[in-house]
């Protein structure tokens, strides 16, 4: 068995590991690092463009980030947090475009309007949401309309074929984006692979993580080509392996992982094959999720640019699969039960029977049934223009709540060892769009001393000018930041007045 020592091991070749790798390599160029990926390349699971449930999340159009309180008011706090997080991501990407670490921005980001669209009784909700968000500087420029004619100008495919008297409403922000996180991850990985002291190994599946006698971590991986096992010792390990993060976290044995479980959710897209509607539609149009639907299954008619080509997707339709990865095993879910999380998992399961029923119903939908759902957004959709494509796999967090009862959580969370030597990212949605802030969270949990040094402070400020300063609190800083990122990323800029 081959052995070696490095400062950092990154497990998983997705956007999270790539982002953390770049952050650490910029902050500590002399550190040795190794990235281990089980597949033949990076970004082939949830980070991939076809597998990502939503791209460019800024809470501009995703209605599940702005719930209505019991008193009828709209809670916009989560939307503010997500929007701030995306601004941080844009700064980080802009810095690396400027430094030529990334290719031209058109290789991974494009301007695409973000819209919300509702019908009937949901109009009052959207009106209240628009009123609440439009007062906040982060959401400046959000247009609202109940006019079918105006909505038709924004998105013809949504309005065509509707009765003119139908009660509808839409919001639109012109400066939304579409992000290809697969391309971004590939480019960051290529950049890292060229750096001294960085090793990227594909076809290497991590099978065990254990403490060494010195207090470091021994990471054991299987070379799926040769069948040989390799062991590497590291001072710090990050597990950014998507659905595989949870079982690997268990193997580490850290007490902080006790009680955590996972609930897998699969997805499927309807993909348009007719060039005409693809060309006509240019927006990400989000609607209201069905009661009981998980957040990554909010239906949307979605313009994306994948490998330089404009695409039109609808969905994702949720489903249930016991895999924790798209290219995983049907046994993943069952093998995730252990003595530390059994109670948590059973309690969460009993409390979420309606969700399970919803997912099973989604799985049972025929192609014709899915087209009928699409017609709620695009009334003149033609059956022959659409085909079904499998999306990525998500594993939602299950953990004890404040009453110590197992609870299904929607979102992401960093779980770290007490000494900061190991961290894992669990969960899904908003995911990739907030990768930079999530990985800054890893630094804050695991590298507290280093963050206090002038070297780290100055470098982080260089990469992310607003780091430590919320943009929503400073109109001048917000405009300065958006002007800077828009210029480098070739995005439209609208100053906040």
UniProtKB/Swiss-Prot annotation:
Keywords: FAD, Flavoprotein, Oxidoreductase, Tricarboxylic acid cycle. It catalyses: (S)-malate + a quinone = a quinol + oxaloacetate. One of its GO terms (molecular function) is L-malate dehydrogenase (quinone) activity. One of its GO terms (biological process) is tricarboxylic acid cycle. Disulfide bonds: none annotated. Its EC number is 1.1.5.4. Gene3D superfamilies: FAD/NAD(P)-binding domain (3.50.50.60). Its cofactor is FAD. Pathway: Carbohydrate metabolism; tricarboxylic acid cycle; oxaloacetate from (S)-malate (quinone route): step 1/1. InterPro entries: FAD/NAD-bd_sf (IPR036188), MQO (IPR006231). Pfam families: Mqo. HAMAP family: MQO. PANTHER family: L-2-HYDROXYGLUTARATE DEHYDROGENASE, MITOCHONDRIAL. Belongs to the MQO family. This is Probable malate:quinone oxidoreductase. It comes from Wolinella succinogenes (strain ATCC 29543 / DSM 1740 / CCUG 13145 / JCM 31913 / LMG 7466 / NCTC 11488 / FDC 602W) (Vibrio succinogenes). The gene is mqo.
